[in-house]
Amino acid sequence: MDTTSRTRPDDRRGRPTAAAFFDVEGTLLAAPDLAAATGPLGRLWHPPVLAALHGHAALGHLVVLVARAGATELAPITRDLAPDAVLCSRPEAPMIGQGKGYAARALLRECGILAARCYAYADEAADLPLLAEVGHPVVVGDDPVLLRHARRGNWRRLPAPSAERK
């Protein structure tokens, strides 16, 4: 799949048995659009989501960034975080909506990881297909559509980025 890129060598012993998918815009970063983000990345990280990413990495989970942005725009983020994989937009295939769910499913199949053992973190209704692909969805913020799903499915929640970080 050419929307996936590996960003670090697999130096773990054995294969990962779980994955954690992190929507970038508005979830991992407080900025809803990377093109409009200015200043150092450190100010833009959403601390609870960044902590979750580091926690999953420490557990040996496959860490995957999922973004509407393209690979060039994501380069500073991938350099800082060194995820295992990146699912991002290409000119002919934007990474939005159902595309995020399809890409996540394809990556899990390729890696032989059961979706029931996986996590996804996202902030808006358009990310519902990504959240629906995993056994442990986490809603970030207060999108009303996602909150309804979270209440029905007993999904975890994390707070939205604070206004002064945006």
Residue ranges and their predicted role:
Residues D2-F22, L41-K166:
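C-terminal cap/substrate-recognition subdomain and adjoining C-terminal extension
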Residues T27-L29:
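Hydrophobic "anchor" residues
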Residues P32-T38:
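Basic, amphipathic juxtamembrane/active-site segments
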